[in-house]
Design a protein with these regions (language model features):
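Residue-level recognition of single "structural anchor" positions
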Residues: 1-222
């Protein structure tokens, strides 16, 4: 656990296998995924204040695949980033099946406090956020101006860089939610004074996490 939390960007299963001298890649892989599942704390506080929300893809589109929101060959994600002045506060991420109104509204309700200001792009699925102050932004690219939703777009960029860098592009779509858990855990604790605090927090959450076996993890469906 210390090997994982002491590294700023984490490590891949192959890296953990080498560091610990494990004879089996499967053992390192299982250890990492158990810990990634423990990185989500039940009952964690929702985001609040001003929160930017946007959707993105992971998969074939990253390598020049087909484009367009309704292409289902890609893994769909939604990301929320809390504003902390001009900086980024806490974040949340989730895999989603589609960009329909019901799906996007459920993510917002599960992760953002009612009464918060939710900033989105012009996608119609975001309309009628009745429990929130909705700041819907549509940009005319010909007119230029400041980029829309800068915080959440930066978070999305950092996530993709992390998936391609630390994990060397090996993040399987089947387990992508576990990788999102780790990224959120690390990002939300990036200001911790010491790596020891991350270790303590993860150990605390791992003790209370539901058990996960190799067969449970590998029997998942995408």
């Amino acid at each position: 656990m210390w090997c994982i939390t002491s590294q700023k960007n984490g490590m891949s299963a192959l890296g953990l296998q080498r560091v610990l001298g494990l004879g089996s890649y499967r053992t390192a892989w299982l250890m990492l995924h158990k810990l990634r599942q423990a990185m989500v704390r039940p009952g964690r506080e929702k985001l609040c204040g001003q929160v930017e929300v946007d959707e993105t893809y992971w998969g074939s589109a990253e390598f020049g695949g087909a484009t367009g929101r309704k292409t289902l060959s890609k893994v769909l994600m939604i990301v929320a980033a809390e504003a902390d002045g001009k900086r980024i506060g806490r974040i949340r991420m989730a895999l989603i099946e589609d960009f329909d109104r019901k799906t996007l509204h459920r993510f917002i309700q599960d992760n953002i406090e009612p009464g918060s200001t939710v900033c989105t792009d012009g996608l119609n699925s975001y309309r009628e956020l009745n429990d929130y102050i909705h700041n819907r932004k549509v940009q005319n690219l010909r007119q230029g101006g400041e980029p829309l939703l800068p915080r959440v777009h930066l978070v999305i960029s950092l996530l993709k860089r992390w998936l391609l860098g630390t994990l060397q592009g090996s993040a399987s779509d089947k387990y992508l939610d576990d990788y999102l858990n780790e990224f959120v855990f690390r990002f939300n604790r990036r200001k911790s004074a010491s790596r020891g605090k991350l270790f303590y927090r993860l150990a605390q959450q791992a003790v209370n996490a539901e058990p996960a076996t190799y067969s449970m993890l590998t029997s998942r469906r995408i």
